[in-house]
């Protein structure tokens, strides 16, 4: 297998909602035609109507995508690798809580209840809470994204 120096990211415009179907067809064409100039096919999860191909040149992208029903064409220009990683990486802003903080549970079976943070397990993204609205002390472990800070 040849080692290609230049890997560029090209954007295919496709019919909205057909991104996964187009990606599967592209994958099948790449395998059956033994094309080694395309390195990856990316379907950005939050962007409708686009499929990103990592390839050596635009001629390869046009060759492999020609004749596919839902492909509208190749977008002009290239896209940077940093932009592609931004599209596909999962970045969730977790609330900053520490022991002793008052929080409100925003989802799950304890939704709407006030609680006090007993312990934060940052490796698991979980928090141990003491529910304040119960008649006896109840400690529960919930995911960190299910709480919202109220007071410190």
Curated annotation (Swiss-Prot):
Any single GO CC term annotated in Swiss-Prot or TrEMBL for this entry: ribosome
Span of domain KOW: 99-129
Any matching Pfam family: KOW
Transcription is among the record's keywords: yes
GO annotation terms (biological process): regulation of DNA-templated transcription; transcription elongation-coupled chromatin remodeling
Disulfide bridge map: none
GO terms for MF: structural constituent of ribosome; translation elongation factor activity
Keywords: Transcription, Transcription regulation
Subunit organization: Heterodimer composed of Spt4 and Spt5. Interacts with RNA polymerase (RNAP).
Function: Stimulates transcription elongation.
Family to which the UniProt record says this protein belongs: Belongs to the archaeal Spt5 family.
Protein name: Transcription elongation factor Spt5
Lineage: Archaea, Thermoproteota, Thermoprotei, Sulfolobales, Sulfolobaceae
